[in-house]
Amino acid sequence: MAIHLYKTSTPSTRNGAVDSQVKSNPRNNLIHGQHHCGKGRNARGIITAGHRGGGHKRLYRKIDFRRNEKDTSGRIVTIEYDPNRNAYICLIHYGDGEKRYILHPRGAIIGDTIVSGTEVPISMGNALPLTDMPLGTAIHNIEITLGKGGQLARAAGAVAKLIAKEGKSATLRLPSGEVRLISKNCSATVGQVGNVGVNQKSLGRAGSKCWLGKRPVVRGVVMNPVDHPHGGGEGRAPIGRKKPTTPWGYPALGRRSRKRNKYSDSLILRRRK
């Protein structure tokens, strides 16, 4: 990832650091429009996810998370920007004429060849079942349910590690630090997701943040009591509670939000950090 630092000419470019290498040129048969959702609101119009709204219109790129083009090699033709995720995507031309988008593996360049199947080489970008991978393999785009497509380790720079195989299950260490069991028949892609330096980017101004659909973040302590439990008081007053809370009065900062008695509790050997 090439980070471009602006030459300071205006206040908005003083602290900007953006990626100037990857562009977007989507294929018409691999994109479709998407409805602009309710800006963080639910069906009743109540805010359930804060600081969302506005943003530029986006076209959704159809990503091949299943990698079910078995035993057919494909060639990386382009590496493109995707506005719907922080990872890059690359266009694959398969030998049978099929064209698909996949997540860009770290280190992959235009012209590289990838393949998916049961007996394929353990090389970057190849997709195969966990049972055919050696221990210690770095993987991403991991299936939870067989045939459903990859659901884990899909963000930019994400990578998981295969640490054990026993019986019908494989043990993985996920990017969050969680250690859990997954069926050995599930597939994954070898390597790490690209765009590792995404956290080095600095938009430099509020307007660029708004283009991404992210609204300003306001502290609860400066609100009125009707808007937040921390609000109110004369001047710079404390929050008036023993512990911080969310805008809806639930404990914040450390409260576990995972639902109890989920079916996957028995599959998690060590919870996330």
Swiss-Prot record:
Belongs to the universal ribosomal protein uL2 family. One of its GO terms (molecular function) is structural constituent of ribosome. This is Large ribosomal subunit protein uL2cy. GO terms for biological process: mitochondrial translation. The gene is rpl2-B. Gene3D superfamilies: 2.30.30.30, Nucleic acid-binding proteins (2.40.50.140), Ribosomal protein L2, domain 3 (4.10.950.10). It comes from Liriodendron tulipifera. Residues 1-27, 224-273 are annotated as: Disordered. The keyword Isomerase does not apply. Part of the 50S ribosomal subunit. The keyword Ribosomal protein applies. Keywords: Chloroplast, Plastid, Ribonucleoprotein, Ribosomal protein. InterPro entries: NA-bd_OB-fold (IPR012340), Rib_uL2_dom2 (IPR014722), Ribosomal_uL2 (IPR002171), Ribosomal_uL2_bac/org-type (IPR005880), Ribosomal_uL2_C (IPR022669), Ribosomal_uL2_CS (IPR022671), Ribosomal_uL2_dom3 (IPR014726), Ribosomal_uL2_RNA-bd_dom (IPR022666). It is found in: Plastid, Chloroplast.
